[in-house]
From Swiss-Prot:
Organism listed in the record: Rhodopseudomonas palustris (strain BisA53)
Protein name: Pantothenate kinase
Gene (UniProt): coaA
A GO term for molecular function: ATP binding
Binding site for ATP: G96, S97, V98, A99, V100, G101, K102, S103
Main location: cytoplasm
HAMAP family: Pantothen_kinase_1 (MF_00215)
Amino acid sequence: MDVRADQHQYNPYRVFSRDQWAKLRDDAPMTLDAQEISALRSMHDRLDLQEVEEIYLPLSRLLSIYVASMQQLYVAQRRFLGIVDRKMPYIIGVAGSVAVGKSTTARVLQALLARWSPRPKVDLITTDGFLYPNAVLERQGIMQKKGFPESYDLPKLLAFLSDIKAGRRRVRAPVYSHLTYDIVPNSHITVDRPDILIVEGVNVLQTGKLPRDGKAVPVVSDFFDFSVYIDAEEPVLREWYVSRFLALRDTAFHDPRSYFHRYAPLSDEEATATALAIWERTNLANLEDNILPTRPRATLILKKGADHVVETVALRRL
């Protein structure tokens, strides 16, 4: 295949145009209908049959190859070591900025992978559940940095992923409410030995500081077998964030339980100014300082244009 010359920011990747990538679908069957695709789409994200056929079906086909190869390697390693071990799930990370469409991508992948033969068990979690409760963030003076690396209970998240990777049964993860903008007390989801686990979050590819004494310092991505970064230019992300904020002002913010209920009465001009201020103060800073620098660590990068559709795909060379 004639693949375009790598762009400097994507080295060491093979970069495919949308048309080139779409041809890699080969004979992968379409297993979702229009109604199912609509249900997977997040607010203001664009997802239709064509996007699934041209972008996500080729990715599903690629992942089937990666998963099968990992399973063969796992069996070979067990045979080499002479051990009997628990089944290890394949873990996929999905990263990218606020408002870029991570949740849609993660849900589409979950739906497509779960329809492989012989119907693997595919679970999905977001790292939002591992944010510290608002009371803790307020006490530490970092409420304005919610979503930054320091706002997560990293030891709890690492322990969760370690248990999953070890094949343990009924591993629990905290639940986060986007309505109340906080951890739901005494509420958990249970992940019970999936074949594939998708982990979605803004900072899942974040690295830690290198130790001076040579001791291992684990990071979330140490547990990933494959990772996807959803990319878009900053002005586009800003526009998407503002559009989403305005849409939520007209819907979810009207619920008295909403953390952002105070924004419901705002005019379009006031809501736009508020959204831009939040973007500049929190989301842009997090993007520039923490999220975007992790892009080169991804296995695959999906670059979106202003219309929300993927324009290029960059796949890390083996």
